[in-house]
Curated annotation (Swiss-Prot):
GO biological process, one term: regulation of gene expression
Taxonomic lineage: Bacteria, Bacillati, Cyanobacteriota, Cyanophyceae, Nostocales
Cofactor: Mg(2+)
Reported function: Digests double-stranded RNA. Involved in the processing of primary rRNA transcript to yield the immediate precursors to the large and small rRNAs (23S and 16S). Processes some mRNAs, and tRNAs when they are encoded in the rRNA operon. Processes pre-crRNA and tracrRNA of type II CRISPR loci if present in the organism.
Name of the featured protein: Ribonuclease 3 1
Organism of provenance: Nostoc sp. (strain PCC 7120 / SAG 25.82 / UTEX 2576)
Pfam family, one: dsrm
GO cellular component: cytoplasm
Enzyme type, top EC level: hydrolase
Domain of life from the UniProt record: Bacteria
Amino acid sequence: MYKLLMFRDDKLLRRALTHRSYVNENPEEGEHNERLEFLGDAILNFLSGEYLYRSHPDRGEDELTRRRSALVDEKQLAKFAIEVGLDFKMRLGKGAIRDGGYQNPNLLSSTFEAVIGAYYLDNNSNIEAVRAIIEPLFESVPEQIVVVRSNVDSKNRFQEWVQRNIGPTPPKYLTEQIGGFSHAPEFKATVLVGEKEYGEGIGKNKKDAEKAAAENALANLNKQELLP
């Protein structure tokens, strides 16, 4: 059995594996895992941030933020959940199982967070015990996957945020060449919504500059705690 599933308190592990849908169908089971999920999410954000801070001393805040998002996004946490054997151990309601819950990335990732939170409590709130489990998982993610995920669709992600929070008006990118050479120009892009500037970025072509501006806009929103 994977070490993450070795608990002193079996009831705590059972609660971490129990989804709300199971409790709805079995009220006598008591508490579901959402409070533990909240705790695990906070722990994973801290440990991933600390791990990246130590392992990438040459990276700036924006890139570290993007890399952390890639390490603890739903897709990656779901993979971790399967790797440690959580998938068919999840306690789901019949409807969730019928809808493919054991393969559902959202359920897998949230259960993984809950088990991390529970493991922390089971080890007397010792963060070192969790670090010993989670850092090898972080290290197992190929660098190329982290890079690709951290840079994927930043313009689309920002546009989706605008549509959800402001309205249908798409972001506008103002791009100009600011220097470089004819064979290696340098461009600067500024992204606006209406008349408000949200971010800016520099790149070797217009596309890269606009992507950097969108990434900067997302980083600014994250600082203001405006991203989900």
